[in-house]
Amino acid sequence: GFTLESWNKKQVFVDKAGYFSICVDNPAAEFEIEIVKDGKKAAEKTAEKADYVVAVIGCDPVINSKEEVDRTTLGLPPEQEELVKEVAAANHNTIVVLISNYPYAIGELQKQVPAILLSASGSQELGHGIADVMTGKASAAGRVNMTWYHSDEDLPDMNDYDIIQGKRTYQYFDREVLYPFGYGMSYTTFSYEKMQIKKERGCIKVSCFIRNTGEKTGDEVVQLYVHKKDSRVKRPIKQLAGFERVHNIKPKEVRKVNFTVQLWELEYYDVISERMILEDGNYQFMVGASSQDIRLEQSIMIDGLHAGKRNPFQTTAADCYDAYDHMFLHRGINGSSCVIPGSAGDDPDMIGECLVEGTLIYHDFVFYKKPRKLNITLKVLETAHITVTGENGVQITAEP
């Protein structure tokens, strides 16, 4: 048997009226499962007799995919995986309709069925829309707006919110994925041709042509990405700079697609000057059908600012670091920020229990002549053991 818990972790019992109640003094009720009808077996028998099977699985936006519910795994519910496995074994013409508002790790599911159709939840026309796409009445042209990973091992600790250091999202993840950001299939194919790029006042203009090389009319979602080469800081591998869904392109038809990228959209926050800057240098623009299906690319030089250099004779705020390891940003005094050592999942308010050593790195301190004596002033809130290390063997240890 098994017991039940309420949402606030209290045991459940059955009262005299036969209703579920929360335990106060009563012992928790013990329940047993009695199988009246095996739904999976019934689905399997039905699948054996059918020409095609449509298996609808996924999540519910008011139960397990609502706000405040954190998943502990990317996997599908085991019962759903087992259902598809048994139905697909009974009928190889099984199409899975996955209703989901977030990514799943469905690599094994992908091997079991010939087609998977993804749709977000909601909408009273959901059924009609799915039917139109499955029958070819409407062109399939949806694109995933998140990266779909192979497994939980591809992600860092769920308490680690740093997408750069944790290498999350299409911008920083550098390994193979199940479905890349922007991915989606169509009933036809497209070629990309004649990319052009030019600078205008305050913006970059990018254009290309797409050609329907298939036999059916369809839509294509053309995506523009950008990457800053040789940046002082770690910039995204690719960053979406624009996209356009081009509707109803007939076979052999050619359409022109135009993008305008404002220069301020290429800025990043510079921790040295503590403001947004447009870094000068070489920018790579890429056009494609997804973040990993790049068809055309060109580079262009953009005039901007040189990345800053740190002045050793001015105060550098502790939270204006270039890199870190095992550190938290936290509340300081008088509304300021501070940095404290800790690991993902630690409570930064319990600094005495954060026992790991942390590292902060500040690049590009420039001395215009070699100093004979170096004085470093550090401001700390609590007793700490601090070691300052430079590139040329400079090491200072202080215990405030």
What spans do the regions from the language model cover?
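Extracytoplasmic
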Residues: K9-D25, E30-I35, N282-Q284, M301-P400
